[in-house]
Swiss-Prot record:
Residue ranges annotated for the UIM domain, each copy included: 162-181
Domain SH3: from-to ranges: 222-281
The name this protein goes by in its record: Class E vacuolar protein-sorting machinery protein HSE1
Topological relation to the membrane, as annotated: Peripheral membrane protein
SUPFAM superfamilies: beta-sandwich domain of Sec23/24, ENTH/VHS domain, SH3-domain
Record keywords: Endosome, Membrane, Protein transport, SH3 domain, Transport
PROSITE patterns named in the record: SH3, UIM, VHS
Subcellular location: Endosome membrane
C-alpha cells in the first residue's frame, strides 16, 4: 500500500478540528480521490481515518464520522466492506466504551452506526455493523436518546366533557362579543367612558396590590400554540407528521392522550408529545422590549444608507481617513447581532405564513371537490319531470264529431291513419287535419271498419302520400285510448259476408 499525499491532505482538511460543521465540499473531494483507485486508496484512507478517530479531539471525531458515512455511500462495495469489517467496528466500539469521551460524541457514534446498519441491511456480508449496533444498545442503553413512541390511546371521558365545556364557553363568549359589536354604535361613548374607568381602577389596584396582580397572571391558563422538536421522528402511518430535530410545529388540536395534531411546512399530521417541548409565548413585557429593540434597528436605517452611499462614492480612496465614514461605521456596527436575530425571526414568520397559505389552498381545493361532488350527486338523484296530465284537446265547434271519434283523440286518429304513434297531446299538422276531417265525413260504423273487406282494401291501398307514412293494417280491435272498454257503445254482431277476391280487385 503506497502513500497518497493528495488523499491524506484532503482527509486532513475535511476532518479539521477547526470546522464547526461538516463541509460537504471537502467530503466529496475525498470521495472523488478515493474512487480513482478504491482498493489501494481506500485502504490508505481507512488507515488515516482510524488514526484520527483515536484522537481525543471531539470535533475531529465528529467530522471523521461524517467522512465515514460519505465514503460508505459514495465509494462502492470496497469501502463498505472495510467500514463494516470486524477491525473497524471494534474501533468504533472502543470510542463508545471509553469513559473519557464525551456522551455527545458517543451518541453521534451510535447514530452513525444505526445509519450504516440500516444502509447495509440488505447485504449479509456486512452484518458486523448491525451486530455493533445491537451490542452498543445492550451495553450502553443510556445512549439511546430517542424515547419510545407512545400508544394512541383515546382521551378519557372527563377530558372530552371538559373540552365540550370549553367549546361551549368559547361559543358563548363569541356570541356576547358579536352582540356587543352590534350595539356598539348606539352606546359607543358610554362604553368608552366605562372602559376608561375600569382601566383606571385596575391600574390603581395593581399599584396598591401588586402581588394580587401577579397571582392573577400566574393563574391564567397557558395555551400551547407551538412546540419544538427535540428528536427526529419518521412517520410510520399515513396520518403521522415527520419532522427533524429543531423544527417548530404549530399545534392544532389534541387527538389522543399523548398525541397532538400539528402543521409543519404545509403538512398536517399527529405527533407524539414526548418528542417535542412546548414553546412558551412571550409575555407583554418581553414583547414590548423586543419591539423597542426592533425600533432601534430601524432607526439606524438612514445611517446605513448614508454609509453605503459614502462607500460607493469613495471608490479607491483611503476610507480610513474619512471621519464621517468612521463615525457612521461606529454607530452601525453595534446593531449587527440584532439584525441577525431579526433576519431569523422574520424568516421564521415568512415560513409560517407560507405554510398557512399552503394549508388554506389545500383546504380550498378539498372544499371545491366536495362541493362539486355533492352537486353532481344531487343532479343524478333529481326525479324526472312528471308527465302532463289533463284532458285531451277537443276539436273546435266547426268540425262535427262522429259517434266513434269521441272516443279517440286527434293523436289516436292520426295513429290509426298512418300506423305510427305520435307523442301524447301532439296536434296534427294542417294537412293531417284536412285528412282527418275527410275521414270523419266518410266514417263508417265500427263493425264495418273491422270487416274483412275494409281490411283487404286497407292492405291494398298504397297510394297514401301523407307525412311519415308506413303502410300497415288497421288493428282488428279498437285501440286503447285511456278509457275503459265499457264506455264503447255496444255493436250488434254481424255475420261475415262472402265475397269474391277477384271481383273485389276488379272493382278497385
Amino acid at each position: 500500500m503506497s502513500s497518497h499525499p493528495k488523499v491524506k491532505k484532503a482527509i486532513e482538511r475535511a476532518t479539521d478540528p477547526g470546522l464547526r460543521v461538516d463541509n460537504w465540499g471537502y467530503l466529496i473531494e475525498v470521495c472523488d480521490l478515493v474512487k480513482v483507485d478504491a482498493e489501494d486508496r481506500g485502504q490508505y484512507a481507512m488507515k488515516i481515518i482510524e488514526e484520527r478517530l483515536l484522537k481525543q479531539d471531539a470535533n475531529m471525531i465528529l467530522r471523521t464520522l461524517s467522512l465515514v458515512v460519505a465514503l460508505a455511500e459514495n465509494c462502492g462495495s470496497r469501502l463498505q466492506q472495510a467500514i463494516s469489517s470486524k477491525h473497524f467496528t471494534g474501533i468504533l466500539y472502543k470510542i463508545v466504551d471509553d469513559s473519557q469521551v464525551h456522551v455527545a460524541v458517543k451518541r453521534e457514534v451510535l447514530k452513525v452506526v444505526h445509519q450504516l446498519a440500516d444502509s447495509f441491511k440488505n447485504d449479509p456480508s456486512l452484518k458486523y455493523m448491525h451486530d455493533l449496533e445491537s451490542k452498543i444498545k445492550i451495553s450502553h442503553p443510556e445512549l439511546i436518546s430517542e424515547p419510545r413512541v407512545p400508544k394512541k390511546k383515546e382521551m378519557s371521558k372527563d377530558r372530552e366533557v371538559e373540552e365540550e365545556k370549553e367549546l361551549a364557553e368559547a361559543l358563548r363568549l363569541s356570541l356576547l362579543e358579536f352582540e356587543k359589536t352590534g350595539s356598539r354604535q348606539q352606546v359607543q361613548q358610554p362604553q368608552q367612558q366605562q372602559q376608561q374607568q375600569q382601566q383606571q381602577q385596575q391600574q390603581q389596584q395593581q399599584k396598591l396590590y401588586p402581588q394580587n396582580a401577579e397571582a392573577q397572571q400566574q393563574q391564567a391558563p397557558t395555551v400551547i400554540r407551538k412546540v419544538r422538536a427535540m428528536y427526529d421522528f419518521n412517520s410510520t402511518e399515513q396520518d403521522e407528521l415527520s419532522f427533524k430535530k429543531g423544527d417548530l410545529i404549530c399545534v392544532v388540536e389534541q387527538v389522543y392522550r399523548d398525541w397532538w395534531r400539528g402543521t409543519l411546512a404545509g403538512s398536517v399530521g399527529i405527533f407524539p408529545l414526548n418528542y417535542v417541548t412546548p414553546v412558551t409565548e412571550p409575555s407583554q413585557q418581553e414583547l414590548a422590549a423586543e419591539r423597542a429593540k426592533d425600533e432601534q434597528v430601524f432607526a439606524q436605517k438612514d445611517n446605513v444608507d448614508r454609509l453605503q452611499n459614502k462607500l460607493r462614492e469613495a471608490g479607491n480612496a483611503d476610507i480610513t481617513q474619512d471621519q464621517e465614514i468612521n463615525d457612521l461605521y461606529g454607530s452601525v456596527s453595534p446593531i449587527r447581532p440584532q439584525i441577525s436575530k431579526m433576519l431569523g425571526k422574520y424568516a421564521q414568520k415568512k415560513e409560517d405564513l407560507v405554510s398557512l397559505r399552503q394549508i388554506l389552498a389545500n383546504a380550498e381545493i378539498t372544499y371545491n371537490q366536495l362541493l362539486s361532488r355533492a352537486s353532481n350527486a344531487y343532479a343524478y338523484s333529481a326525479p324526472p319531470p312528471a308527465p302532463m296530465t289533463g284532458p285531451a284537446p277537443t276539436p273546435g265547434p266547426q268540425s262535427p264529431m262522429s259517434p266513434t271519434a269521441q272516443y279517440t283523440s286527434p293523436t289516436n286518429t292520426q295513429t290509426q291513419m298512418n300506423g305510427i304513434p305520435n307523442p301524447p297531446y301532439s296536434y296534427p299538422l294542417p294537412q293531417q287535419t284536412q285528412q282527418i276531417q275527410q275521414s270523419e265525413q266518410t266514417q263508417q260504423p265500427l263493425s264495418q271498419i273491422n270487416s274483412p273487406q275494409n281490411y283487404a282494401s286497407s292492405v291494398g291501398n298504397t297510394n297514401y302520400t301523407g307525412t311519415n307514412h308506413i303502410p300497415q293494417p288497421l288493428a282488428p280491435y279498437p285501440q286503447y285510448t285511456g278509457m275503459s272498454m265499457q264506455s264503447i257503445p255496444p255493436q250488434q254482431p254481424q255475420m261475415p259476408q262472402h265475397y269474391n277476391m277477384s271481383s273485389n280487385s276488379n272493382a278497385q
